Structure formats: structure tokens, C-alpha cells
């Protein structure tokens, strides 16, 4: 009986999500957002949605770290260890900056491209019909509005 309880406890500890304190990473968000002149609220909103501030997050598709960078994107923007908080935020913020330039500051397209890949969104522009992409854009927008204006402002209706 003790052995069974111990196994259940160990299994629960492995499955239960870890509580992550975002405070240490938020300083890097402010630092790199300021350096690359991109909204720190946007970067933080992407992290909220992508990993919920878990620096060890690993997706089923292989995206890694706080900003869920794919290996090629991480290398392209200078994160050689995507699980390193500072490298991940620096590279992710550089990527967001590149997307801001590519999509002329349109936050909907930036969020869609961050989720679905910049090449697919560049071809279709606002004609993204994938419900997962639309849901992602809305989730990022909601977190952005909460961070920028507080929870009440985020309740306004938004069309992607």
C-alpha cells in the first residue's frame, strides 16, 4: 500500500504543472523590448499565451522555452540555448521586431505569424481562416489589453 501511494505521489509530481514566478523574466522582457523598440506588453502577452512563463516549456512540435521558439527560429535570432531565459526572450523579441517590420506594425498579423509562421501569413495576409490561428490572435490580444490597460478594457469586442 505504501509503495502504491508513493508511486501515485511521484506520478502526480511529474504531471502537476510547476508554478512559475515570472518576475525574473519580466526584467529581460523590459530590457529587450526597450532595446528593440517593441511593446513590452506584446512580448509579455506572447509569453502568457505561449508558455505561461514556464522557461522549460516544450511543445509537441518542438518549440522551446518561454517564447516557444522553434529550433531554426531560435538559432536565426541568436538563442543557442532556447531554455535559457535571457537568450529566449532576446531572440523572441528580435523575432517579434522582425515581424513588426514585415507586417507594418499590424498586431493581428504579427500574432498570427508568430503562431503559424511568417511565410504562411505573409502569403494570405488577413485571410487567415484557421480557427486555431484566430483563437491564438484573440488570446494574445486579450493578454495584451490586460497588460496595457487592465482587465476591464480587455472585455471590449474585437474582430480579428
What are these regions (language model features)?
Residues 19-160:
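Catalytic glycan-binding domains that act on GlcNAc-containing polysaccharides
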Residues 13-15:
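N-terminal signal peptide c-region/cleavage motif recognized by signal peptidases
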Residues 2-8:
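Sec-dependent signal peptide recognition
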Residues 9-10, 148:
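Enrichment for repetitive, rod-forming helical segments
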Amino acid at each position: 500500500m505504501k509503495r502504491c501511494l508513493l508511486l501515485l505521489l511521484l506520478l502526480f509530481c511529474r504531471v502537476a504543472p510547476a508554478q512559475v514566478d515570472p518576475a525574473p523574466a519580466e526584467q529581460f522582457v523590459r530590457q529587450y523590448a526597450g532595446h528593440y523598440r517593441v511593446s513590452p506588453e506584446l512580448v509579455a502577452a506572447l509569453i502568457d499565451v505561449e508558455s505561461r512563463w514556464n522557461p522549460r516549456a516544450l511543445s509537441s512540435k518542438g518549440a522551446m522555452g518561454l517564447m516557444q521558439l522553434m529550433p531554426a527560429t531560435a538559432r536565426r535570432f541568436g538563442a543557442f540555448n532556447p531554455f535559457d531565459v535571457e537568450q529566449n526572450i532576446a531572440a523572441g523579441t528580435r523575432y517579434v521586431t522582425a515581424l513588426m517590420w514585415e507586417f507594418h506594425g499590424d498586431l493581428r498579423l504579427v500574432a498570427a505569424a508568430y503562431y503559424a509562421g511568417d511565410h504562411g501569413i505573409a502569403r494570405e495576409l488577413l485571410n487567415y481562416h484557421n480557427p486555431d490561428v484566430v483563437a491564438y490572435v484573440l488570446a494574445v490580444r486579450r493578454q495584451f489589453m490586460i497588460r496595457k490597460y487592465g482587465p476591464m478594457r480587455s472585455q471590449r469586442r474585437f474582430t480579428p
